[in-house]
Amino acid sequence: MQAFTAEKTELLATYGADAHCGLTEAQAQKNKEQYGENALTRRKPDTLLKRLWDAATEPMLLMLIAAGLIALAVNIVRQVTGGEADFLECVGVFVAIALSVVISVVMEGRSAKAFEALSKINADMTVRAVRDGQTVTLHSAHLAVGDVVLLSAGDKVPADGRLLESTALRVDESALTGESFPVKKDSELVLTDEKTPLAERANMLYSGTFVTEGNGRLLVTAVGDATEFGKIAGELGNAEKSSTPLQEKLARLGKTITVLGVIAAGIVFAAQLIFFAFHGGLHLEAVMEAFITSIVLIVAAVPEGLPTIVAVSLSINIIKLSKQNALVKKMIASETIGCISVICSDKTGTLTENKMTVRAFYDTRWHKEAAALQNEYLTHNICLNTTADLAPDGGFIGNPTECAMLRFFEQADTGNTYRREREDHTRLCAFPFSSELKHMTTISNVDGRILSYVKGSPECVLDMCALKPDRLAELRRVLVQAEEQAMRVIAFAHKELAEMEDFSAKEAHRRMESDMVFDGFVAIADPLRSDVYDAVAACRSAGVGVKILTGDNIVTATAIAKELDLLADGCVALEAKEVEEMSDRRLQKMLPKISVIARSTPTVKMRVVKLLKARGDVVAVTGDGINDAPALKNADVGIAMGISGTEVSKEASDIVLLDDSFATIVKAVEWGRNIYENFKRFISFQLTVNIASVICVFVSVLMGLPAPFTALQLLWINIIMDGPPALTLGLEPGYSDLMRRRPTNRSENIISKGMLARITATGVYMSVVFLLQYKLNFLGAAQGEMTTVLFTLFVLFQLFNAFNCRELHSESIFCHLFKNKLMLLVVGCTFVLQVLIIQFAGAFFGTVPLGIAMWGKLFALAFSVIVLSEVIKVFARLFQKKKA
């Protein structure tokens, strides 16, 4: 049985309640046992162990753990068999793993604490209910199904229920349905269709919504998890978040590196066996050594610094975003936001302020400034013909439309307040607004004159006025102009009465509301946030599409979309019912051209998000209402409003905007894109080193040459590869053209074709030069200097190549050379350390001091890697120019 289709008497009997006396305490306790408490089941927070496990089971970390265990096993075998073990490599891998896990857990723990502080659970909410025939004040958590609750303007509805009585009752359901205007409720309405949409159930009230005017008696029919609010919260708790694009790409990269590492190791192993066979040294010990060398090669191919740079970069971005009023709950979201290609945004409270505002008024022409409000009949009508009020903090008490007009009057600076206007002019009689009459009337004594003030729908009020046909036609044109901009227009008129009489009599009432004087229109709307225009324009230039999915009607939604220029280039606005009638295939095909979906439901939002992701889009969903929560949870990035947002929407999101500013999203996108580019810089650097080292080891084995580096020299090279010089690539500031590039596709590899070409060319070049020096000694190194020269050449190659890796596209490295000052400092310090190692720590590192001439040769030769890169980029720019 659905509460909205059942008779009131039937429901009262079912719950053992009386319409006037409510529940007895005994029945209330019985109902609590049967239907549950009025509290949501809160999901237990993850334990520290669970958070550590989640952080350690990222794809790249799993690959690192495997590499570390293999390296450990190999070195144990070496130790047991009397060989030279190097446990420093193992320590390096496991330190990198621990660092990444700790940073992830600590940063997400900080965000979780901040979120707990932000969340305000409605534990202190009290309600008026009827128990044992007495009106009592109860804690909302103590309500039971069957309780009769008394509600009036300003109250928050504590549970779902069927209306028993209602008087001029209107409720703000924007958090649940997305409808921006308060909805009229009717206790006498009986619905027969069990499929009636939630937004059209006028005989029901729902938990989490607000009474804006009127009063009513509510029979509670659902509490806690059984409410519409609770059902959505429950679904969110059970939903699993899908992997993010970065996680997917890093997983693919990890698999690729592993496969290539295994292939390279297999080739090296086979080459060593062939070499030993030809030279008569093929025995078990040689095979074992060849196998260990191959395994070490696999471990060397793994970029163990990558998880650390990911964790550090994400942490820095979280701190940056927190300073810009964005709380990142899930660390990975601070990068994912940079990859988004579509934002599915709610309208009410996200793009708009969710506060009714007077946009303009009309007397003889339209005025936007409150200071122009000089017509005393219009001002008296606004102040006297209303039941609304403004709170001391500026909040609305009563009908939002009437409150907006009172605020507008206060801004007019007439030298008077609306409260003083009410005190100075006695109200004699009032006829409240009704949906049937579509207007309200107040009769007041104004300076000794009896004046009737009426306001309401323009059609109704214009019919009451004595207007010439041409004036009436002109006013209707004015009216259409305002309505086309999705503004709600209220008309005003007045009439001076000869004397006070009983105007409730039908004939007297008709005379009072005829031959009135038209005073003007007031146009009201929920205005767009001031920063939304620039934010949407920035999204457009960044290639990020914006779609409005709102519970509002098609006219309002279309007007907002036009104001934001979202319906250009053949884009359309549709209603949810049109979307529901489409097949998945047709809808997926049309989605690029659909900019607005009006009367949207949670189901439609979820379907749109799912199909956008299937197309390869990376989707962000913004919202503040309960109805936004499922889509927030299932999007790649869910963004909730921190001020106007409901607790359910915040719980479901990945990022909470503490200032409710849509513009903050644009900043987050920019920083997220920068993080992604920095990952690519770091990966480019590491893979170049890997390719160079693999080729050097492979060819050295084939040529029968001894290992070019000692264990300590390898450790120093590893520090450069994974340490500060490499990490500073992950801190490269964003470039000015970052928000003019297209977003990365979900299926796009983290290593582009251009990157792969540069990585391969640079890696091969460094290897060839290194091996030529090893074999031919074209630098003319003395007999005892060869190891030192090779070691220094390899290190300098990596330091200069770090500058190449700063530019991912075809720009010259000299364009932004001084932008990352930290990198310049770190690379400079590393070079100084290299000089000190060579010149003064030879006994420890197995090197000998080099002369100035040799240092000059090495410096010039290593710098050639930059020259090579710049030449390649010149040709790339010429090719791009020719292609354009």
Model-derived segments and spans:
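Conserved cytosolic headpiece of P-type ATPases
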Residues: 1-743, 748-751, 764, 775, ...
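Alpha-helical transmembrane segments of multi-pass integral membrane proteins
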Residues: 80, 758-773, 796
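Generic alpha-helical transmembrane segments
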Residues: 720-721, 766-767, 788-802
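Long hydrophobic segments that form regular secondary structure
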Residues: 774-783
